[in-house]
């Protein structure tokens, strides 16, 4: 496409942080498929929280994915999902962000959808494609996002990915816009006890997302499929 490929964008500081993360990585990250079926839940974020507490990485870098949708006055639709790249990735893992239909999908005549959160759920359900196709059938972006979340909830069957009550023990947030400019952000859990939620800033426990129109930027509360926060007891 004409872009110059950089050989290595690491700094000495970032490389040291990555090496420390790699040193602390739990062997249970590397479960074989046959072992994953019966494995108990592993808190993969524990290492990152410890690295932040130790000052190895700043708290603002806890999450790495950003999604943005847009539509202009002519009705042209666009969407983009960025991620943290190779940082904190399990060797061999393929993220959802670069997979069209998983972490991102756009149809210029219908709308755009993308997400932040557990990428494997998107790869399994092709969630962004599902949302855009739901909007094609006339659903509002909010209802289309809720349908994708319900699909993920029902398809999450591995014990290690479920709370004692059967609900997912991970969060995921969808962002969608249609060609008319109607928009929504909907999370599996729209409340969060952490300083920052999957979607961005929290207002008390309510996660909020950013919106920018001709009237300027503002934040709005996310809707949620499951009441409460991910951290609430099941």
Q: Can you say where each PLM-predicted feature lies in the sequence?
A:
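N-terminal nucleophile
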Residues: 1-234
